[in-house]
């Protein structure tokens, strides 16, 4: 049996606890802190069997002015447990002088050492402890506290902190030197708080201490309830009374397995977490990385990925890998239309927003004893993004995780093919398939469903298969962040205030990107309409208009927008499952019918429910090129073909009564021949780099993508494999690559 990397030591401790609170003096004699504490413990000992944390301490951490002391007292009263303020009850009693006097006496650096030493000589259990603002800057003392405590970070808006400190007439903070502002020091301190916390309480501006205390208790309950956030298959049938309950999966298991054993896709068993209006407003001034951490912490239980580790992953994923510091900026195009630029990552497509993070999540979740092979079907952008993302893992992880990207040999642009092939590394390979994307995607699903083959790989090679397409929850979840972030950027740029509705228009093939926008709405972003834009392969447009998903006599057309040249939209199943109130039986019937009869029809009530939120239309090839041309001539902005598809559809169906955010899913550099044709540039048989330099001479927006330009300069021709459109042939390639990598 596999043991997944989940922190089960977080389970609730319910046994009776008696606080033992003491400080070691210089003579190592133990003395009780105060008579008050001892009496409080005697008075409350009867209540301790019902303690929220048992013997563990609740440790409140945050900057000066966060309200740790006040909130700690409220929690102590609610739980009937001892309350310890490190400033008043530890430091001043140890030093026999005030904290300010000690700081004045020894200076900043020595103060931190003296403070840390005092905390190291202190122990307690079953108590609420309010730290000083500088405690987290001393590693040894924080490890000492963390051993028997749950550290809760009170994350208070910066302006609130500054206002409170003025009211408190605080004129100096530990570590503040002449010339350093309080604002700069508080920003500097954040790195230490992020390092230590187990749970974060994201405090709204103006929140009362009582509200914050309730949030702390809820955060601790969530932290300890390791079994509360699980995932089910979209084809999961809820058991009737008396029937055995099927076991759900944890986040880490859903990420590792990718596809459910019954052929369905993993979705949360409960509703998406929702942020309050005040919490969203507090994120308006945050960076993309800060927004990502807040949102993903709400969606990933700390037993699956501890908050501090998740923060490290996010900073690695969205650090120097992106050409724009805003990661996914929003640019005003014209009128009520805005462009969400999702192409600043290393491979120039929106896939980077997921696939720079997902490999780190995957590597954290897998057990150390097995090797893993990620199978990917790509219609253009996913392949290079997956190969690039997994190539950035550390050496140890790359030795146990490999990637195989299958792409239609003649179904992607020349640049995309060169990019996929050029992204091969020591743990990643590209395989061209003599068929279309739908065959590649269906073949991978069949490989996953073949228990004999997957079992053979596990037994013979100690290798397990998984996926990195948007069927994998770990791949889909990070996409929620940029849709939420786009809305917050419109607020920060002064175009809207929180609560104002927006529409989104997204070029759609596999339904993952637009589904992520649906999840952003569930978290509290007021998206009014989801506009689904298709190219000539408009099966989704037809479905949204009629409720009939029909693949009969429908052939895949190759277009200027190959990443949405898709007929089987995998993530549609997740949305139908959501609309149908998690009816797994219905999903099983519909998608089995699609597999056997190549079509299905949903009932009228579901069609009407779908059309309440969704609008759909499609764009011809001529309209796509015309949109690229007209947009450049009117605004100096070059759209890639996928974004042009969305622009055409948006112009046709949007009523202009609210702002419209168009997802720009790729950089135009990847489609230079189509762009040159659209801009009526004389066709020249030149290299890709020459074409990009020519486009660069137009000084258009956005500027050339430097990473893509560097890719075109690489003259070496990397080898890759090509195989026939046969599932068994794909299996043999997978086995051979496993032998080469792991044996």
UniProtKB/Swiss-Prot annotation:
The record ties this protein, via InterPro entries, to: P-loop_NTPase, Shikimate/glucono_kinase, Shikimate_kinase/TSH1, Thr_synth_N, Thr_synth_N_sf, Thr_synthase-like, TrpB-like_PALP_sf
What residues bear N6-(pyridoxal phosphate)lysine in this entry? 351
Task: Kindly state which keywords UniProt assigns to this record, in alphabetical order.
Answer: Acetylation, Pyridoxal phosphate
| Cofactor(s) listed in the protein's UniProt record | pyridoxal 5'-phosphate
Q: Does the keyword Acetylation apply?
A: yes
Q: Which residues carry this modification: N6-acetyllysine?
A: 281
Pfam families recorded: SKI, Thr_synth_N
Q: Give the residues annotated as coiled coil.
A: none
Cellular component GO terms held in the UniProt record: cytoplasm
Secreted found in the keyword field: no
Query: Record's NCBIfam families?
Result: thrC (TIGR00260)
Q: Which family does this protein fall into?
A: Belongs to the threonine synthase family.
What protein name does the entry list? Threonine synthase-like 1
- Native source species: Pongo abelii (Sumatran orangutan)
Q: What is the lineage of its organism?
A: Eukaryota, Metazoa, Chordata, Craniata, Vertebrata
- Gene name of this polypeptide: THNSL1
């Amino acid at each position: 049996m596999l043991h997944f990397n989940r922190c089960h030591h977080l389970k609730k401790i319910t046994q009776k606890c008696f606080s033992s609170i003491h400080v070691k003096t210089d003579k190592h004699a133990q003395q009780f802190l105060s008579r008050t504490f001892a009496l409080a413990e005697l008075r409350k000992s009867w209540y301790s069997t019902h303690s929220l944390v048992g013997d563990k301490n609740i440790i409140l951490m945050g900057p000066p002015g966060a309200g740790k002391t006040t909130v700690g007292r409220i929690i102590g009263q609610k739980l009937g447990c001892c309350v310890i303020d490190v400033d008043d009850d530890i430091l001043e009693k140890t030093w026999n002088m005030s904290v300010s006097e000690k700081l004045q006496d020894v200076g900043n650096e020595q103060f931190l050492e003296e403070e840390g030493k005092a905390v190291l000589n202190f122990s307690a259990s079953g108590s609420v402890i309010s730290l000083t603002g500088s405690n987290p800057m001393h590693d040894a003392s924080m490890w000492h506290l963390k051993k028997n405590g749950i550290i809760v970070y009170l994350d208070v808006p910066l302006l609130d902190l500054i206002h409170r400190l003025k009211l408190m007439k605080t004129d100096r903070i530990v570590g503040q030197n002449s010339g350093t502002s309080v604002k700069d020091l508080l920003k500097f301190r954040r790195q230490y708080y992020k390092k230590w916390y187990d749970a974060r309480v994201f405090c709204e501006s103006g929140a009362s201490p009582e509200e914050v205390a309730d949030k702390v208790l809820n955060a601790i309950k969530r932290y300890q309830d390791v079994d509360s956030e699980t995932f089910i298959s979209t084809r999961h049938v809820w058991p009737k009374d008396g029937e055995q309950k099927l076991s759900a999966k944890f986040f880490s298991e859903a990420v590792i397995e990718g596809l459910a054993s019954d052929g369905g896709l993993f979705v949360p068993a409960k509703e998406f977490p929702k942020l309050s209006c005040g919490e969203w407003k507090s994120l308006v001034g945050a960076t993309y990385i800060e927004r990502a951490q807040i949102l993903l912490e709400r969606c990933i239980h700390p037993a699956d990925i501890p908050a501090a580790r998740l923060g490290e992953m996010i900073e690695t994923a969205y650090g120097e890998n992106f050409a724009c510091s805003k990661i996914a900026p929003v640019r005003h195009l014209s009128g009520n239309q805005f462009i969400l630029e999702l192409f600043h990552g290393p491979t120039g497509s929106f896939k980077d927003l997921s696939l720079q993070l997902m490999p780190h999540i995957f590597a954290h979740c897998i057990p150390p004893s097995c090797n893993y092979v990620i199978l990917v079907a790509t219609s253009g952008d996913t392949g290079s993004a997956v190969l690039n993302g997994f190539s950035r893992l550390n050496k140890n992880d790359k030795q146990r995780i490999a990637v195989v990207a299958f792409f239609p040999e003649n179904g992607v642009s020349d640049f995309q093919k060169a990019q996929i092939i050029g992204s091969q590394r020591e743990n990643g390979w590209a395989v061209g398939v003599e068929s279309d994307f739908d065959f590649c995607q269906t073949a991978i699903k069949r490989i996953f469903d073949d228990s004999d083959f997957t079992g053979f790989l596990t037994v013979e090679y100690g290798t397990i298969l998984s996926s990195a397409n948007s069927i994998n929850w770990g791949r889909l979840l990070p996409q929620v962040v940029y849709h939420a972030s786009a809305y917050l950027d419109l607020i920060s740029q002064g175009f809207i205030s929180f609560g104002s509705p927006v529409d989104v228009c997204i070029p759609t093939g596999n339904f993952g990107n637009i589904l992520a926008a649906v999840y952003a709405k569930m978290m509290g972003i007021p998206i009014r309409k989801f506009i689904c834009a298709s190219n000539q392969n408009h099966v989704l447009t037809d479905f949204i208009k009629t409720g009939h998903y029909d693949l009969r006599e429908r052939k895949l057309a190759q277009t200027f927008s190959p990443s949405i040249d898709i007929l089987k939209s995998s993530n549609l199943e997740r949305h139908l499952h959501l609309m149908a109130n998690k009816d797994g039986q219905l999903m099983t019937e519909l998608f089995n019918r699609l597999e056997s009869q190549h079509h299905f029809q949903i009932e009228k009530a579901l069609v009407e429910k779908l059309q309440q939120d969704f609008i759909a239309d499609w764009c011809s090839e001529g309209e796509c090129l015309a949109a690229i041309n007209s947009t450049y001539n009117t605004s100096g902005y070059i759209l890639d073909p996928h974004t042009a598809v969305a622009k055409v559809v948006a112009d046709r169906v949007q009523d202009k009564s609210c702002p419209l955010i168009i997802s720009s899913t790729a950089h135009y550099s990847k489609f230079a021949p189509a762009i040159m044709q659209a801009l009526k540039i004389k066709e020249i048989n030149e290299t890709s780099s020459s074409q990009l330099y020519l486009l660069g001479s137009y000084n258009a927006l956005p500027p050339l993508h430097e990473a893509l330009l560097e890719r075109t300069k690489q003259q070496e021709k990397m080898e890759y494999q090509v195989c026939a459109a046969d599932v068994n042939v794909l299996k043999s390639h997978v086995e051979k690559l496993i032998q080469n990598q792991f044996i």
